[in-house]
């Protein structure tokens, strides 16, 4: 649905709004990166299994494990220890995930009022976090041992934050300070 919405409506409206001479200049979604940090995995090797499976079911794609780049004694982490998992979504899986995120997961988040415009990075990319991964319907609440958060990065081909914001607004992203 999102991909069709983008092709049919959003490209035309953004082309008119920003006076692009070519359709290829219109900003588009490039990829969505989802990261789930698992601090417990540094001491317990089996602690990564459940978040790994949860992220796999949320994204619909197998995640990769992330490892510590250096040792930090304050966090009891050694270099090379597993500290989380991540997945990068592109094309159809990306659009499916964003649709589930906007219409199902975000409305189920506690105290969610929308995103701030300050979450753009200055180059047209948008990053935010979700406090509870149980907002997704794919997660069975009875089978999880701990509620975890997720970091989500949306990478666009937009040159500026203004263009990226218009793209995300057209995709029905909830911003509270327009």
Curated annotation (Swiss-Prot):
InterPro entries, A to Z: Ribosomal_uL5, Ribosomal_uL5_bac-type, Ribosomal_uL5_C, Ribosomal_uL5_CS, Ribosomal_uL5_dom_sf, Ribosomal_uL5_N
One GO cellular component, as annotated: ribonucleoprotein complex
Keyword Methyltransferase in record: no
Stated role: This is one of the proteins that bind and probably mediate the attachment of the 5S RNA into the large ribosomal subunit, where it forms part of the central protuberance. In the 70S ribosome it contacts protein S13 of the 30S subunit (bridge B1b), connecting the 2 subunits; this bridge is implicated in subunit movement. Contacts the P site tRNA; the 5S rRNA and some of its associated proteins might help stabilize positioning of ribosome-bound tRNAs.
Entry's Gene Ontology BP terms: translation
Protein name, UniProt field: Large ribosomal subunit protein uL5
NCBIfam families, alphabetized: PRK00010.1 (NF000585)
Entry superkingdom: Bacteria
Subunit-level organization: Part of the 50S ribosomal subunit; part of the 5S rRNA/L5/L18/L25 subcomplex. Contacts the 5S rRNA and the P site tRNA. Forms a bridge to the 30S subunit in the 70S ribosome.
